[in-house]
């Protein structure tokens, strides 16, 4: 068996690379649509300021896009290096949407992004606008296929286990594509990216307004970001509610951990606003509850129960026992006893083989597992409650803070008095980290909440890892952290540098720092203006 330290280090390495990568992805998703909207306004109005907005914000987008691509490449290699059995077991299914993403969406995006930056003087207005919209389409199609793959990991549909090949095989591509978990995850994730882009533009525009510079540019950027952000944050909240319903349908252990729902209470269940989960005692101390809310969100009804952790553990224990039976039948089939009776018996409990594989963490002989090992494996099916509970509330808290921000910003922009509200501009500026807090904690909830599974109910995480040494993993982990941190420092340096320069970085002669230089030259000292003229003339 692969040691637990190897599995944990492999998980840590993948989590680190994924979280670093997802620092860049949401901003890319959001900025592409903001750029497309800004350029659409430019084409419709013909006003030069909107073209300058596209070019300036596009410069910041380009920096972010380049580093996002760089950090994303490493993740794909890890499926082969760190998760070899995972790649063998489900590679034909998981690889299909990733291959489609690379051959279609990424090529579309990467091709047209060059035309976006270098086609201003070579394309007509309409042609360049089409290019910008195609960049936005490509980035969102990339997200679609990647999240189809991830959604299948959360809720594996359209695939069956083949005992002849000992692998999962795709039997229904339509079910894979239309997986409700994948679709909800896609729209919720891209909407969160739109919010990230809107907060980014809003915060930097507020900085310019506070500094009283490039006001026309900043006002228009503020207005577009506030309107786009308002629509996006409302979408995130609605789609987040839908995501909660899907989790309640197919990932009951994740939902119970998020809500620290230890017991199965009478319907409709109350929502725990805040509290302190005590995992040892299996209770939540000092819980503040809102009646009915959890039941309505998770079940869309007033009479369906939300299953508690204790009952889920008991249910999973029964499924582990079924999995032991199926594992025994699988061994007989592999030994050559492929009678119709054996195959029929195997297929009757085929959905529970993954639960039987949970015992591999404790014993190589699944069918001979002890009662203690079965009970421990059943407990493992519940992710860490405290980390899930607090991460979810951090995500929701950041989301509602941004809702307040966009309501205020949209109202002020509609009344054209945002400059007279320094408290709002400071609120927007200091809110810049909020979308990253929300997206990072949201992904933690999504991925950590799937544990102990790599593929929900099918393949346990401890079986998915490659046979590596801890030394190899520590070395590569340290190298990746150093490299990714360097990339992050480069991104921050370039972003801050160009954000401070603002549209003056376009060198059009129309903006703040360029006008200061022109003013300085115009009022240069006499000796500079005319070397033949006396200094005190």
Swiss-Prot record:
EC annotation from Swiss-Prot or TrEMBL: 7.1.1.7
Entry binding sites for heme b b558: 188, 395
Gene name as annotated: cydA
Transmembrane segments annotated in the record for this chain: 25-44, 97-116, 132-151, 190-209, 222-241, 395-414, 473-492
Keyword line: Cell inner membrane, Cell membrane, Electron transport, Heme, Iron, Membrane, Metal-binding, Oxidoreductase, Translocase, Transmembrane, Transmembrane helix, Transport
Membrane topology label: Multi-pass membrane protein
Cofactor note: Binds 1 protoheme IX center (heme b558) per subunit. Binds 1 protoheme IX center (heme b595) per heterodimer, in conjunction with CydB.
Subunit structure, interactors included: Heterodimer of subunits I and II.
Ranges per topology, Periplasmic: 45-96, 152-189, 242-394, 493-537
Gene Ontology CC entries for this record: cytochrome complex; plasma membrane
Organism of provenance: Azotobacter vinelandii
Protein name: Cytochrome bd ubiquinol oxidase subunit 1
GO BP terms: aerobic electron transport chain
